[in-house]
């Protein structure tokens, strides 16, 4: 039992479960709780939620089970915190959230919990699309595209849109055709730059990036992860460059940009 001048009721244990986590958040939000936790809202911890999910993804990429366990706990804490905020308003609680997702999983897996037949992952996905459209009362493929979260990173959102379009009957181009389209887009951008055109180059770049996500899908790779890995390689390459310059007792910031560029290109 917690003790103190303003003690709260809580039983310490050797091992806790999800019900304990919900109770801990309730205590933190109570009048006797934490000054910081008491004043948080959905909006103030929104960014924390996003960051925790990304940290969990990083743990997955690292294939580090202990790190993943920790980060999944942080994600779960955020889920519980948001649920407790709603519980305080009398709208729903954590159990309502669990109940809702259980019912959704049962409803979306009639091939497991019902009599629908689906022997391949492709058949499962086809069933899911039909079920989602029905449950969300979506009458067109466009509506399914509009339902893709706008808060997603744009590379992920674009690739999901390509998938929705394909399932809606828009057959994808071959990888070779997409590369030709990307080359044509780059040529238009180069022409615009040469002409000092007042055209919106961000639109041209956006079109090229969108085509690139389609190419990634055609090559069965994730555009977001591809760029993530490229960022890592960029850092590694720059680190090698900086260390090589440092061997001469010079900081890279003090080297002429033209020289840095030459050294950079030579490291390719």
What are these regions (language model features)?
Residues 2-71, 77-205, 209-268:
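Flexible "arm" and connector segments at domain edges
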């Amino acid at each position: 039992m917690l003790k103190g001048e303003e003690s709260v009721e809580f039983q310490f244990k050797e091992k806790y479960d999800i019900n304990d986590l919900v109770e801990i958040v309730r205590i933190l939000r109570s009048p006797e709780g934490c000054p910081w936790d008491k004043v948080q809202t959905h909006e103030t911890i929104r960014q924390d939620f996003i960051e925790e999910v990304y940290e969990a993804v990083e743990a997955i990429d690292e294939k580090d089970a202990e790190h993943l366990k920790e980060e999944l706990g942080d994600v779960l804490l955020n889920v519980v915190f948001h649920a407790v905020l709603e519980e305080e308003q009398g709208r729903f609680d954590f159990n309502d959230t669990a109940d809702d997702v259980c019912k959704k999983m049962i409803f979306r897996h009639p091939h497991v919990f019902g009599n629908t037949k689906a022997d391949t992952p492709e058949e499962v996905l086809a069933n899911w699309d039909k079920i989602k459209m029905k449950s969300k009362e979506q009458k067109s493929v466009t509506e399914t595209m509009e339902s893709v979260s706008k808060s997603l990173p744009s590379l992920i959102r674009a690739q999901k849109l390509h998938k929705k379009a394909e399932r809606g009957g828009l057959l994808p181009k071959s990888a070779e055709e997409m590369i030709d389209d990307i080359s044509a887009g780059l040529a238009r951008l180069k022409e615009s730059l040469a002409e000092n055109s007042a055209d919106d180059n961000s639109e041209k770049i956006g079109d090229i990036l969108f085509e690139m996500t389609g190419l990634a899908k055609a090559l069965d790779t994730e555009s977001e992860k591809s760029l993530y890995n490229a960022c890592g390689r960029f850092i590694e390459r720059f680190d090698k460059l900086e260390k090589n310059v440092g061997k001469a007792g010079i900081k890279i910031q003090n080297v002429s940009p033209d020289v840095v560029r030459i050294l950079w290109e030579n490291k390719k």
